[in-house]
Curated annotation (Swiss-Prot):
Organism: Rhizobium leguminosarum bv. trifolii (strain WSM2304)
Lineage: Bacteria, Pseudomonadati, Pseudomonadota, Alphaproteobacteria, Hyphomicrobiales
GO cellular component: plasma membrane; proton-transporting ATP synthase complex
Entry membrane topology: Peripheral membrane protein
Binding partners and assembly: F-type ATPases have 2 components, F(1) - the catalytic core - and F(0) - the membrane proton channel. F(1) has five subunits: alpha(3), beta(3), gamma(1), delta(1), epsilon(1). F(0) has three main subunits: a(1), b(2) and c(10-14). The alpha and beta chains form an alternating ring which encloses part of the gamma chain. F(1) is attached to F(0) by a central stalk formed by the gamma and epsilon chains, while a peripheral stalk is formed by the delta and b chains.
Location, primary (coarse class): membrane
Name listed for the protein in its UniProt record: ATP synthase subunit delta
Listed PANTHER family: ATP SYNTHASE DELTA CHAIN
Family: Belongs to the ATPase delta chain family.
Gene3D superfamilies: N-terminal domain of the delta subunit of the F1F0-ATP synthase
Localization annotation: Cell inner membrane
Length: 188
């Protein structure tokens, strides 16, 4: 299977699972608690390379994945819908798509609240004031409240890469230097 097909498969799986989780959470009035659990689990993924490898690895059996997910959920204080959701995901051997499920759930929840999500990549962590200023600027462009997810990537050197829906604004120093390099090659 080509790489693009694998990515589309993962995305489709993630969106279906996230949609099901959101529908159930909405029906039970638990969207906020599920979102908090999602955030807690995402923070654990971000902090632990071992957990990231475990989630992505097809080597572990469904039974091993289920046992580990139950232990991790209990230790992190994750219960209710999201804990049960994690069990279903592990039992169905879909942990590899969990990061996409979390992302898709956030997008669905934001859309439900009348917000849009923006993915922001920065060379350095943004201060609270910078995040607020960015939200205000994006709201003036989109006309909607904006939630932002910031990723730090030192390789962009400076500036920002902002993705809102299908639009991307790249003001990174890396891109500007690359453009300058191409322009100089054409001149010389």
């Amino acid at each position: 299977m080509p790489v693009a097909d694998t990515s589309q498969l993962t995305s489709g799986v993630a969106e279906r699972y996230a949609s099901s989780l959101f529908d159930l959470a909405l029906e039970q009035g638990a969207v906020d608690s599920v979102t908090a659990d999602l955030d807690r689990f995402q923070a654990m993924l971000d902090e632990s390379a071992d957990l990231k490898r475990f989630v992505a690895s097809p080597v572990f059996s469904a039974e091993d994945q289920l046992k580990a997910i139950v232990a991790i959920s209990e230790k992190a204080g994750i219960s209710g819908f999201f804990a049960n959701f994690l069990k279903v995901v592990a039992r169905n051997r879909r942990l590899f798509a969990l990061p996409g499920m979390i992302k898709a759930f956030r997008i669905i929840a934001a859309n439900h609240r009348g917000e849009i999500s923006a993915e922001v990549t920065s060379a350095h962590a943004l201060s609270q004031a910078q995040e607020t200023e960015l939200k205000v600027a994006l709201k003036s462009v989109t006309g909607k409240d904006v939630t932002i997810a910031v990723t730090v990537d030192p390789s962009i050197l400076g500036g920002l890469i902002v993705k809102v829906g299908s639009r991307q604004i790249d003001t990174s120093l890396r891109t500007k230097l690359s453009t300058l390099k191409l322009a100089l090659k054409e001149v010389g």
